[in-house]
C-alpha cells in the first residue's frame, strides 16, 4: 500500500491530470504538524485561473479517504494526515511478512545490469583507495539485485599495460627472490617504486619498460611467464582481502582478457572512417563534443586502456545484453570514460548511453593522497586488521564478558570501515579518523550495529512474553516517537530506489542512520518491558522486532554483517 499514491488517486478523482504527474508533485512537509504528504496547487493556477490558496481550499473540501484521518489546506498546499492505525498496521505487517526481502521489489523485471568494481592492479598492493570502489560497487550490486534486476559483478583486473613492461624491467634488475617468496606484493611494490625513482634520473628506463611491454603484447614466452607469475601472486593476496570483506565476483576478466579482441575494435573504428593519425598515434577526434581525442593506438603500435575498455564494453553488451553497464572507478577517470562512451556512440552503438561512470573521491590519511609510484600506500588488509584489533580493545573495555568477542570485533571493525566509505556522497574525499569511525555514538557503523544489538537484546528478554502477532493493537503505537519510527521504516524501499536511480549508496547509509536515531529516540522516551499495560508492551515489542529487521536488511545491502550481542 503506497499512501502517497493513495493521496494522488484521491486528487485525480477531482482534477483532470495524469496520476504520475500528480504523484510527482506531492511532497513530504518539513514538519509533522503540517501532515505526512502535501500537494502544492501552484501549477493548477494557470489552468484553473484561480489563486493557489483558493484552489487548495476548494480541492480540500472534495477530498475524502479512509486512509487519511484528516485532509487540510494550508495556504497553497493540501495537506494529508495518514490514519496512524491503518498506516502502522500495514507497514509493520508488511515488514514481518517479507522478512529478509522487505524493501525489495520486482522493479527491474529481470533486466541485466553489469557492475564493474574493485578492479585492483596486478602486482600492486590492495590499498585503502581500492576499498572505495569495492564498497560502492558491492553496495550497488546488492541494491540493484534487491530490486529485481539480474546483476553481474565484474572485477576488471588491471592486469595489462605499460606498467608491466616497467615491472619486468625492475624485476630483472632489482628483485630479491627471497623477499618475493616471503612477501610478494611488498617486494613487487618496492621494485616498482625503485623503477620510478631511477627513471627520474635515467629516462631511458622508460624506453626499456615500453620495450618489455611490446614483447608482452607480441606474446614473448619469457615475458608472458613473468606476467603470469605476477598475476598469480597478486590474486592470492587479493583473495585474503575479499574473504575478509565477504565480497565475491562473477567474472575476473581483466584488461588482458581483451587483448585478442582489440584488433577487431580498431578495425571497426577505421572502417567507419573515425580513425585519424596524430603525432604517429591512431586517435578518434571528439572536437565537436569539446573532448580531447581518444587515443586508440600509441605511436609505438601498442594499445592503451581506452582500446581495452572499448573492447570490454562491446564484449559485455554481446555477452550480457545489459540494460545498464556501471563502471565504479575514481573521479580522476571521468575524462577517460567520456572519451570511451562518446567513441562508442560514434561507432553507432546505440546502447552507449546505457554505460554510466560512477566516480568517487580520494582517501586521505594526514592530508596525503595515496600514490603507488611514490610508495605512499596503506595496505587494506593491515587497515582492516587494525580496525578489528581496536574494536576488540573497546569491547574488552566496555563488555569483557561478551561471548564470541573476536567474531563480534571482526564484524564491527570491518563494518565500521565499510560504513565510513558509504556514509557520504561518493564524490567527497574520505579522511580517516579512527576515533570517529569506531565510535559507538554519532553517525557511525558501530552506532547502527549497536542499535540493532540493543533491539535484539530487548527481544531476547521478552521471549517469555509470547504473543500472537495477529492480535496486536496498533492504536497503542500512536505517540510521536513511535509513529516517526514507523514512517521511517515504511520509507525503506523508496530510499533504495532513490539510491539506485542516483547511483548513490550513501542514501541507504543515511537511511539506516535515521532508523537507528528514531529507534533510540523511541527507546529513550518509552518503557518497553515495563509498559503501562500488556497491550502497549506487545505493540512496542512488535515495533522493536520490525526495526531490527529493517536495520539488518539495510546493513546487508551495504555489505555489513549484523552483531546479535554487544
From Swiss-Prot:
User: Keyword Protein biosynthesis: yes or no?
Assistant: yes
Q: Which UniProt keywords apply?
A: Aminoacyl-tRNA synthetase, ATP-binding, Cytoplasm, Ligase, Nucleotide-binding, Protein biosynthesis
**Which terms does the record give in the GO molecular function aspect?**
arginine-tRNA ligase activity; ATP binding
Q: What InterPro entries does the database record attribute to this sequence?
A: aa-tRNA-synth_I_CS, Arg-tRNA-ligase, Arg-tRNA-synth_N, Arg-tRNA-synth_N_sf, ArgRS_core, DALR_anticod-bd, Rossmann-like_a/b/a_fold, tRNAsynth_Ia_anticodon-bd
**Membrane-spanning residues:** none
Write down any Gene Ontology CC term. cytoplasm
What EC number(s) has UniProt assigned to this enzyme?
6.1.1.19
The enzyme's first-digit EC class, named in words, is: ligase
The short motif 'HIGH' region is annotated over 120-130
CDD domains xrefs:
Anticodon_Ia_Arg (cd07956), ArgRS_core (cd00671)
Cellular location of this protein? Cytoplasm
Q: Which reaction equations make up its catalytic activity?
A: tRNA(Arg) + L-arginine + ATP = L-arginyl-tRNA(Arg) + AMP + diphosphate
- Provide the GO biological process annotations: arginyl-tRNA aminoacylation
SUPFAM superfamilies, per the entry = Anticodon-binding domain of a subclass of class I aminoacyl-tRNA synthetases, Arginyl-tRNA synthetase (ArgRS), N-terminal 'additional' domain, Nucleotidylyl transferase
**Family per similarity comment:** Belongs to the class-I aminoacyl-tRNA synthetase family.
NCBIfam families attached here? Answer: argS
Q: What is this protein called?
A: Arginine--tRNA ligase
User: Which species is listed as the source?
Assistant: Clostridium kluyveri (strain ATCC 8527 / DSM 555 / NBRC 12016 / NCIMB 10680 / K1)
Amino acid at each position: 500500500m503506497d499512501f502517497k499514491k493513495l493521496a494522488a488517486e484521491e486528487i485525480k478523482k477531482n482534477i483532470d491530470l495524469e496520476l504520475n504527474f500528480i504523484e510527482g508533485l506531492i511532497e513530504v512537509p518539513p514538519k509533522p504538524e503540517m501532515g505526512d504528504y502535501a500537494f502544492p496547487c501552484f501549477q493548477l493556477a494557470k489552468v484553473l485561473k484561480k489563486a493557489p490558496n483558493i484552489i487548495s481550499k476548494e480541492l480540500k473540501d472534495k477530498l475524502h479517504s479512509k486512509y487519511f484521518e484528516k485532509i487540510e489546506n494550508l495556504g497553497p498546499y493540501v495537506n494529508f494526515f495518514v490514519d496512524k492505525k491503518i498506516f502502522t498496521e500495514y507497514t509493520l505487517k508488511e515488514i514481518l511478512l517479507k522478512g529478509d526481502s522487505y524493501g525489495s521489489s520486482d522493479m527491474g523485471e529481470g533486466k541485466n545490469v553489469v557492475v564493474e568494481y574493485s578492479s585492483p592492479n596486478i602486482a600492486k598492493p590492495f590499498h585503502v583507495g581500492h576499498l572505495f570502489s569495492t564498497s560502492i560497487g558491492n553496495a550497488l550490486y546488492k541494491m540493484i539485485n534487491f530490486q529485481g534486476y539480474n546483476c553481474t559483478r565484474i572485477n576488471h583486473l588491471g592486469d595489462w599495460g605499460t606498467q608491466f613492461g616497467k615491472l619486468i624491467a625492475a624485476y630483472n634488475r632489482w628483485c630479491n627472490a627471497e623477499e618475493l617468496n616471503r612477501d610478494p606484493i611488498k617486494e613487487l611494490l618496492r621494485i616498482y617504486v625503485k623503477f620510478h625513482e631511477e627513471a627520474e634520473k635515467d629516462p631511458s628506463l622508460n624506453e626499456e619498460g615500453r620495450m618489455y611491454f611490446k614483447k608482452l603484447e607480441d606474446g614473448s614466452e619469457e615475458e608472458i611467464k613473468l606476467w603470469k607469475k605476477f598475476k598469480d601472486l597478486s590474486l592470492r593476496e587479493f583473495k585474503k582481502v575479499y574473504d575478509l570483506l565477504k565480497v565475491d565476483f562473477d567474472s575476473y576478466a581483466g584488461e588482458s582478457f581483451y587483448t585478442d579482441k582489440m584488433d577487431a575494435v580498431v578495425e571497426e573504428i577505421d572502417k567507419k572512417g573515425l580513425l585519424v593519425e596524430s603525432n604517429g598515434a591512431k586517435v578518434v577526434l571528439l572536437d565537436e563534443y569539446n573532448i580531447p581525442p581518444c587515443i586508440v593506438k600509441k605511436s609505438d603500435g601498442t594499445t592503451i586502456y581506452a582500446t581495452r575498455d572499448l573492447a570490454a564494453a562491446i564484449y559485455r553488451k554481446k555477452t550480457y545484453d545489459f540494460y545498464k553497464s556501471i563502471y565504479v572507478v575514481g573521479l580522476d577517470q571521468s575524462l577517460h570514460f567520456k572519451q570511451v562512451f562518446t567513441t562508442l556512440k560514434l561507432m553507432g552503438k546505440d546502447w552507449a548511453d546505457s554505460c554510466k561512470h560512477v566516480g568517487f573521491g580520494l582517501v586521505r590519511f594526514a592530508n596525503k593522497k595515496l600514490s603507488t609510484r611514490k610508495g605512499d600506500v596503506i595496505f587494506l588488509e593491515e587497515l582492516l586488521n587494525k580496525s578489528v584489533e581496536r574494536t576488540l580493545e573497546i569491547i574488552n573495555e566496555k563488555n569483557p564478558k561478551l561471548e564470541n568477542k573476536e567474531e563480534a570485533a571482526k564484524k564491527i571493525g570491518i563494518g565500521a570501515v565499510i560504513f565510513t566509505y558509504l556514509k557520504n556522497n561518493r564524490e567527497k574525499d574520505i579522511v580517516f579518523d579512527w576515533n570517529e569511525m569506531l565510535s559507538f555514538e554519532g553517525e557511525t557503523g558501530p552506532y547502527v550495529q549497536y542499535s540493532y544489538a540493543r533491539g535484539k537484546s530487548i527481544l531476547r528478554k521478552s521471549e517469555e512474553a509470547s504473543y500472537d502477532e495477529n492480535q496486536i493493537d496498533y492504536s497503542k503505537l500512536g505517540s510521536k516517537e513511535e509513529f516517526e519510527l514507523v514512517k521511517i521504516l515504511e520509507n525503506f524501499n523508496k530510499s533504495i530506489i532513490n539510491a539506485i536511480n542516483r547511483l548513490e549508496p550513501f542514501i541507504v547509509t543515511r537511511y539506516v542512520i535515521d532508523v537507528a536515531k528514531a529507534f533510540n529516540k523511541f527507546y529513550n522516551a518509552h518503557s518497553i518491558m515495563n509498559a503501562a499495560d500488556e497491550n502497549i508492551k506487545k505493540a512496542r515489542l512488535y515495533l522493536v522486532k520490525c526495526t531490527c529487521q529493517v536495520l539488518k536488511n539495510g546493513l546487508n545491502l551495504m555489505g555489513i554483517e549484523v552483531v546479535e550481542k554487544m
